[in-house]
Structures are given as structure tokens and as C-alpha cells.
Amino acid sequence: MASLSGLASALESYRGRDRLIRVLGYCCQLVGGVLVEQCPARSEVGTRLLVVSTQLSHCRTILRLFDDLAMFVYTKQYGLGAQEEDAFVRCVSVLGNLADQLYYPCEHVAWAADARVLHVDSSRWWTLSTTLWALSLLLGVARSLWMLLKLRQRLRSPTAPFTSPLPRGKRRAMEAQMQSEALSLLSNLADLANAVHWLPRGVLWAGRFPPWLVGLMGTISSILSMYQAARAGGQAEATTP
């Protein structure tokens, strides 16, 4: 009953619904792609699952029409990252926020062109939005790698003379942060693989993924994202008096 209540509570929020729609969409694409490619007798079921996946993706695209303001507020609050101690983290975070901020209007124009609201070439705008998404993911990968390197160095650095070792609580916090960064790294890499696939042919492995592989990468990323969100929520509850 507690887990059911937790799920219902998560679905009351926009982010909770978006995560569920995302994981369901990619799971449908994964299973549908496998059935179409490997099980001819079940190809009709696979095709239907791929249609469901497409519709769920379209649903998320429409819901993102309202994300610009939230992203702008976050970008404005972060600013130039004055609260960050590390200059590299500050730089990649600011660039990532800029890429994310530009991504949304580009996707909106592409969607409006497909819906024939605007008379422009949608393919160019889809390519631009996907490129911005890939850039944001690449910056996220660079940030996570840098953070993992720095945290590992701090944990393994020998204790200087006349200084006390790291307190157990701080060490555990750093280890938890390393785990979080590792999960973010894996999630971003999985999404980056799909982002490159959706770029125009001729760019690395663009257009070469079968539907099931796109579904697999997206499912991995979605599950990791949901796990991180649940973990963060649990930690927040644990620290609440």
C-alpha cells in the first residue's frame, strides 16, 4: 500500500508523469522492436507497440511546450554559477543551461511545422533541437567525468601531516555523490547514443540503430533517472525532522 501511495504521489507531479511516460515509451519501443525483428509471428503486436511508443513520445513533445519558463527560471537562478567552487564545472554547467534553454524553442518550431501551424521545414528545426540536446548531454558527460575524477582524488589523497582524516560522515557523502555522478554519466551516455542516432545520416552512427536498440538505450537512461529521483526523494525524507 505504501508503494502504491508513493506511485500515486509521484504521478501527481509533472516530472513524475514525464518519467513514467518516458520509460513506458522506450519499453514499448524495445519490446516492439524485438518482436518485429526477431519474432515474425508476433510482428503485428510489435508494430502496435511501436505505434504506442511513437504516441507517448509525441505526448511528451507537447507537454514540453510549457517547459520554457521553468527552464528560464532555473537558468536565471543559476546565473554564471558563482556558487560553484570549480571553474570547469561552472563553465560546462552554464553552457549546458544555455543549450537546454535554446533546445525548447527549436523543438517547439519543429513541432509546429509538423502540425502545419508554421510553414517552415521541420527537419532543419528537428536537427537543430537534437544537436542542442546532444551538446547538453555531452557537457553533462564532461561534468560527471570531471566530478568523478576530483572526488576520487580527494578520497584517495594521503592525509597531510598534522591534519585529521576525512570524517566518516563526509566520506560517505562524497561516496554517495560519486555514485550519483556515475549514474548520471551512464544515463547521459545512453541518451547521447540515441541523440547521435537521430542526427542526419553521415554523422557518426546516425540512423544506424534499429528500433529495439533505441528502446534499450532509452530504457536504461529512463530507469537510471527514475532510480536517482527515488533515491533523492528518500534522502530528502530521511533528513526532514
From Swiss-Prot:
Single biological process term from Gene Ontology: regulation of peroxisome size
Keyword Transmembrane helix: yes
UniProt cross-references to Pfam families, sorted A to Z: PEX11
Locations listed in the record: Peroxisome membrane
Superkingdom, natural source: Eukaryota
Segments on the Lumenal side according to the record's topology features: 150-211
CC per GO annotation: peroxisomal membrane; peroxisome; protein-containing complex
Keyword terms: Membrane, Peroxisome, Transmembrane, Transmembrane helix
Stretches of the chain found on the membrane's Cytoplasmic side: 1-124, 228-241
Membrane-traversing stretches: 125-149, 212-227
Keyword Transmembrane helix (UniProt): yes
Xref: InterPro entries: PEX11, PEX11C_met
Membrane topology: Multi-pass membrane protein
Subunit structure as annotated in this protein's UniProt entry: Homodimer. Heterodimer with either PEX11A or PEX11B. Interacts with FIS1.
Its job: Promotes membrane protrusion and elongation on the peroxisomal surface.
Family recorded in the similarity comment: Belongs to the peroxin-11 family.
Name listed for the protein in its UniProt record: Peroxisomal membrane protein 11C
Organism encoding this protein: Homo sapiens
Lineage of producing organism: Eukaryota, Metazoa, Chordata, Craniata, Vertebrata
